[in-house]
């Protein structure tokens, strides 16, 4: 499987994404600069965290105007997996690929620590290697991770089982319904504030995030290699 890791000015988690795919899973991966205009040669797209364009105007707003985002939408429309983490999640909401928005943390502070997450839906291409209801430990690092949407959208997320991860026990940012990660209705676009790519090696803080990437690869192989 071949992944694209997008790189915007101000991205700083692209290297961790690359490491998770290349070194931990042994899959093919390339960095793709935000000015690129073709993602057709990739099987999946990873939109990393960081501070794209310095978070000026609004987190993810300027990145959404980059050339590459039109291609990301094509990838999503084709049913290929798209994962946005932290700033990547913010970019995906700005692009309209996921509903809602990420607001300032309610304590107005940048939060950087490991949190507990609950796997609310393990029947997705991003979570099939987890158990339903499993509690995992994943780092966060954000100042604007407070997920918000209107009541109609929230009900739709619940009805369609699109809430994939929630904060368990302690909500670090005030996110609505403790939401930490959601997928689109089709199930091939996931946005999450915690950083699974920072939890892929038990020697350096835990490996609970590795299953996100293993899940993507497993689903892809079932759909392509075994057919």
Swiss-Prot record:
Pathway connected to this protein: Purine metabolism; IMP biosynthesis via de novo pathway; 5-amino-1-(5-phospho-D-ribosyl)imidazole from N(2)-formyl-N(1)-(5-phospho-D-ribosyl)glycinamide: step 1/2
Q: Which UniProt keywords apply?
A: ATP-binding, Cytoplasm, Glutamine amidotransferase, Hydrolase, Ligase, Nucleotide-binding, Purine biosynthesis
Q: Which SMART domains match?
A: GATase_5
**One GO MF term attached to the UniProt entry:** ATP binding
Active site annotated at which positions?
A: 86 (nucleophile), 195, 197
* One GO process term, biological-process aspect: 'de novo' IMP biosynthetic process
Glutamine amidotransferase type-1 domain span: 3-226
EC nos: 6.3.5.3, 3.5.1.2
ATP-binding among keywords? yes
Its primary localisation, in coarse terms, equals cytoplasm
- Compartments where located: Cytoplasm
Describe the reaction catalysed, as an equation.
N(2)-formyl-N(1)-(5-phospho-beta-D-ribosyl)glycinamide + L-glutamine + ATP + H2O = 2-formamido-N(1)-(5-O-phospho-beta-D-ribosyl)acetamidine + L-glutamate + ADP + phosphate + H(+); L-glutamine + H2O = L-glutamate + NH4(+)
Sorted alphabetically, the Gene Ontology cellular component annotations on this record are: cytoplasm
Q: Report the transmembrane regions from the record.
A: none
**Cross-referenced InterPro entries, in alphabetical order?**
Class_I_gatase-like (IPR029062), PRibForGlyAmidine_synth_PurQ (IPR010075)
What assembly does the database describe for this protein?
Part of the FGAM synthase complex composed of 1 PurL, 1 PurQ and 2 PurS subunits.
NCBIfam families reported in the protein's UniProt record: FGAM_synth_I, PRK03619.1
What this protein is reported to do is described as: Part of the phosphoribosylformylglycinamidine synthase complex involved in the purines biosynthetic pathway. Catalyzes the ATP-dependent conversion of formylglycinamide ribonucleotide (FGAR) and glutamine to yield formylglycinamidine ribonucleotide (FGAM) and glutamate. The FGAM synthase complex is composed of three subunits. PurQ produces an ammonia molecule by converting glutamine to glutamate. PurL transfers the ammonia molecule to FGAR to form FGAM in an ATP-dependent manner.
Q: What is this protein called?
A: Phosphoribosylformylglycinamidine synthase subunit PurQ
């Amino acid at each position: 499987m071949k992944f694209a890791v997008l790189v915007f000015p101000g991205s700083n988690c692209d290297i961790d994404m690359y490491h998770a795919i290349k070194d931990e899973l042994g899959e093919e991966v390339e960095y793709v600069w935000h000015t690129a205009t073709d993602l057709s040669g990739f099987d999946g797209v990873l939109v990393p965290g960081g501070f794209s364009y310095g978070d000026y105007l609004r987190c993810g707003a300027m990145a959404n105007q980059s050339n590459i985002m039109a291609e990301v939408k094509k990838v999503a429309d084709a049913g290929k997996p798209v994962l946005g983490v932290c700033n990547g999640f913010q970019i995906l909401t700005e692009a309209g690929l996921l509903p809602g928005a990420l607001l300032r943390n309610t304590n107005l502070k940048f939060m950087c620590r490991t949190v507990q997450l609950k796997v609310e839906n393990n029947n997705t291409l991003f979570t099939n290697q987890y158990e339903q209801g499993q509690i995992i430990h994943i780092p966060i690092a954000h100042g604007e991770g407070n997920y918000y949407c209107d009541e109609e959208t929230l009900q739709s997320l619940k009805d369609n089982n699109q809430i994939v991860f929630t904060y368990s026990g302690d909500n670090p940012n005030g996110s609505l319904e403790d939401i930490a990660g959601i997928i689109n209705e089709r199930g091939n676009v996931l946005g999450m504030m915690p950083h699974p790519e920072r939890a892929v090696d038990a020697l350096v803080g835990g490996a609970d995030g590795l299953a996100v990437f293993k899940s993507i690869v497993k689903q892809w192989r079932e759909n392509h290699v075994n057919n």
